[in-house]
């Protein structure tokens, strides 16, 4: 009862606290098991003493051995009774944890994992300590065995604070090595919009020119900057779980069973810098000027609802990462050659990988369009005044390249304006319906401040809808990699044909117009493809999706008409140029006629004879020059006919063309997004970019990286990970239990 009372007090403390459960569960009290592990030790030792040892002391066990009952059967019965007691305690402990369902903070999101972790950890730890108690009781009394066991566990549990007297903290180690830390504040898009998540990143302040980036060296900044860095490190240690732990103790070894490697995935750092359990590894240097990094999409939980062993992004090459979860290496200048080569290989191994990536985006996007979440995000952005937001506001450039035609910008702004108008209409309709339902008058004179608030809300919704439109384009650029639409490739072939045949006018201007039209056609083909797929269309679109399809179709028709107009114009110009060239040739030939008519007739006769002779004998004559001239004329005519004849692209040509087109459409829409995602074993992460993208797994905080341009991922690979810890503990449990039963079975009871 004492143990359950202590567990109840601990859980009530969590329930009543307004702090995020992530920070509470990962603090020193829980992580090092300074409370739970000793309590479970006392519980297991007491139960074991009553079941296995007490009968030996009062003579009841000697009486049982005198009966025709084997020791193996007695041992099995005692073991079943022990497991029954431990299971009852584990169930009661889990019931205490269920008090968290009555809280209003974020504990509800992790309560399932927490309850199962308490249940499994109590049983396994109880078995381990029971086995140790049985072995100790063969030499000592019950009280002595419990005291020895408790002291043993306590010493190892308190090894972490003792180690801090000897070893430097990770913050001090990094500070001495010249690292400085930078704090990034942001509102986390999570279940509770009031939770503020603080992210700390290690930043390279200075870098000597000419030093190889692969050396991963940081240079000490001035004393004032170093002092600020140390202060930030200390603040990080006080207010977060930023690499401030030592895991070389049995308390953590057993305490990890209470988490199953699942709780607080984004803050649960199983590896810390400069500790005995960590292989120190400074990650790649991210050059933010080039915006080169990884965009990643996590897959769903592999082992079900409770065991959240997520598929972490390993430190692998592009091929392996892409085949595991779908990863792109991006650069403002486009996809690098190695990336595409690796991507092609990955597509061959797993042709559905891009569809899975798109489904992941679409799932997040449908959740993002939820009415309540939209309002919440709008409120969050209003509170932060969009400071540091990488998303463009209304009127900003579409991040199109300098060689794009202004017609593309006009079409894009037209689409965004219609989308924003749709959002305004939906908001107005919704407000009108709400006013009617509540009986509130819509008269402007009676509304007063409400109208001002409504106008402000409309402004927020406009900004939000503009952001949604950008996200739609981002989705399209991803899905474009897997579009298999013959009409699309027919248009691509047509555009390439027209571009190649352009011989007059400003070539550069025509190429820019073709590139702009090409990009618009690609984008709206993909938009049309998405809205036509019922299984991919989110159900939460509602009337918004119909309006979206209408806008798409209108612009699609506009582009189709523009394409036809260009086609007719090009054909007309081509025919005029061809006819003009033919007339000039006829005029020149008429001027040369006269006295040479006889010679020309004889020359043609000789040419005809020579051609016939060449076809029959396949040999050359004295008139080879004239014959070759005739053949060249015929070849020129044939080439012109082939250019006038449309031919669809082959499979190889399509594959080559998709690489070229993807560069423009992908990076013209995605270059504003930068994700620094989780890799290895719970690296120290920070992220900026697309909100609500797997909000439980990424720290989706909009970040302004304008100050520091060179950032390190400070990573640590644990020598013994959480999963390995559980496996080792299970093996240790079986071994200790077998040894304890051996002692119990063959001891002398006389």
UniProtKB/Swiss-Prot annotation:
GO molecular function terms noted in the UniProt entry: ABC-type transporter activity
Disulfide links within the chain: none
Region (Disordered) residue spans: 385-461, 571-651
Keyword vocabulary terms for this entry: Cell membrane, Membrane, Transmembrane, Transmembrane helix
Polar residues biased stretches: 412-424, 437-451, 618-629
Biased composition (Low complexity): 425-436
Annotated TM spans: 2-22, 33-53, 79-99, 116-136, 143-163, 724-744
Basic and acidic residues bias locations: 398-411, 452-461
Membrane disposition: Multi-pass membrane protein
Pfam families given in the database record: ABC2_membrane_2
This protein's record includes keyword Transmembrane: yes
Cellular compartments annotated: Cell membrane
Keyword Transmembrane helix listed: yes
Cellular component, GO annotation: plasma membrane
Alphabetical list of InterPro entries matching this protein: ABC2_NosY/YtrC-like
Similarity remark: To M.pneumoniae MPN_335.
Protein's name in the database: Uncharacterized protein MPN_333
Source organism per UniProt: Mycoplasma pneumoniae (strain ATCC 29342 / M129 / Subtype 1) (Mycoplasmoides pneumoniae)
Higher taxonomy: Bacteria, Bacillati, Mycoplasmatota, Mycoplasmoidales, Mycoplasmoidaceae
């Amino acid at each position: 009862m004492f143990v359950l009372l202590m567990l109840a007090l601990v859980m009530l403390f969590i329930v009543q606290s307004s702090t995020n459960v992530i920070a509470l569960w990962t603090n020193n009290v829980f992580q090092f098991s300074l409370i739970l592990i000793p309590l479970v030790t006392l519980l297991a030792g007491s139960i074991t003493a009553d079941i296995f040892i007490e009968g030996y002391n009062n003579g009841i066990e000697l009486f049982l051995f005198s009966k025709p009952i084997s020791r193996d059967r007695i041992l099995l019965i005692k073991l079943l009774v022990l497991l029954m007691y431990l299971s009852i305690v584990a169930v009661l402990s889990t019931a205490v944890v269920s008090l968290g369902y009555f809280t209003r903070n974020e504990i509800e999101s992790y309560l399932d994992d927490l309850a199962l972790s308490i249940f499994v950890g109590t049983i396994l730890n109880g078995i381990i300590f029971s086995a140790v108690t049985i072995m100790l009781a063969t030499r000592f009394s019950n009280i002595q065995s419990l005291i020895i066991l408790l002291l043993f566990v306590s010493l190892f549990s308190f090894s972490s604070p003792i180690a801090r007297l000897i070893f430097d903290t990770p913050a001090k180690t990094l500070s001495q090595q010249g690292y400085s830390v930078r704090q990034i504040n942001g509102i986390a898009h999570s279940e509770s919009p009031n939770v503020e998540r603080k992210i700390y990143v290690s930043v390279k302040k200075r870098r000597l020119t000419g030093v190889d980036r692969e050396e991963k060296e940081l240079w000490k900044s001035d004393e004032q900057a170093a002092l600020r860095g140390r202060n930030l490190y200390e603040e990080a240690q006080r207010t977060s779980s930023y690499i401030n732990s030592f895991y070389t103790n049995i308390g953590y070894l057993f305490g990890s069973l209470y988490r199953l490697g699942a709780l607080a995935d984004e803050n649960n750092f199983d590896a810390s810098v400069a500790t005995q359990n960590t292989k120190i590894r400074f990650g790649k240097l991210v050059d933010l000027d080039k915006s080169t990094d990884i965009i990643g999409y996590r897959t769903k939980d592999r082992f079900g609802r409770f065991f959240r062993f997520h598929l972490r992004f390993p430190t692998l090459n592009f091929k392996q990462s892409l085949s595991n979860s779908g990863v792109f290496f991006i650069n403002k200048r486009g996809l690098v050659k190695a990336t595409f080569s690796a991507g092609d290989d990955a597509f061959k191994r797993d042709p559905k990988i891009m569809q899975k990536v798109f489904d992941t985006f679409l799932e997040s996007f449908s959740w993002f369009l939820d009415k309540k979440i939209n309002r919440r995000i709008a409120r969050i952005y209003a509170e932060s005044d969009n400071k540091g937001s990488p998303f463009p506001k209304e009127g900003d450039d579409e991040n199109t390249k300098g060689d794009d035609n202004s017609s593309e910008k006009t079409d894009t702004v037209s689409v965004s304006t219609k989308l924003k108008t749709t959002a305004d209409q939906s908001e107005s309709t919704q407000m009108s319906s709400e006013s009617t339902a509540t009986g509130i008058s819509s008269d402007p004179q009676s509304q007063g401040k409400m109208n001002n608030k409504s106008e402000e809300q409309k402004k927020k919704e406009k900004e939000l809808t503009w952001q949604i439109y950008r996200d739609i384009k981002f989705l399209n650029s991803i899905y474009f990699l897997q579009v298999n639409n013959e009409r699309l490739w027919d248009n691509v072939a047509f555009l390439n044909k027209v571009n190649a045949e352009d011989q007059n006018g400003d070539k550069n201007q025509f190429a820019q117009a073709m590139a702009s039209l090409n990009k618009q056609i690609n984008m709206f083909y993909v938009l049309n493809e998405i809205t036509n797929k019922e299984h991919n269309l989110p159900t939460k679109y509602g009337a918004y999706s119909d309006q979206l399809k209408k806008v798409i179709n209108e612009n699609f028709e506009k582009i189709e008409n523009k394409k036809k107009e260009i086609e007719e114009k090009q054909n007309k110009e081509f025919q005029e140029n061809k006819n003009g060239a033919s007339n000039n040739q006829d005029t020149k030939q008429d001027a040369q006629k006269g006295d040479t008519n006889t010679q020309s007739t004889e020359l043609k006769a000789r040419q005809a004879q020579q051609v016939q002779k060449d076809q029959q004998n396949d040999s050359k004559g004295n008139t080879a020059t004239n014959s070759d001239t005739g053949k060249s004329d015929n070849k020129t005519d044939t080439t012109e006919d082939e250019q006038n004849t449309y031919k669809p692209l082959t499979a190889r040509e399509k594959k080559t063309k998709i690489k070229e087109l993807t560069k423009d459409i992908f990076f013209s829409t995605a270059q504003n997004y930068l994700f620094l995602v989780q890799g290895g074993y719970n690296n120290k992460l920070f992220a900026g970019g697309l909100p609500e993208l797997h909000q439980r797994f990424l720290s989706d905080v909009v970040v302004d990286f304008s100050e520091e341009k060179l950032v390190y991922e400070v990573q640590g690979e644990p020598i013994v990970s959480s999963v390995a810890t559980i496996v080792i503990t299970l093996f240790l449990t079986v071994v200790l239990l077998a040894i304890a039963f051996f002692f119990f079975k063959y001891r002398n009871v006389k």
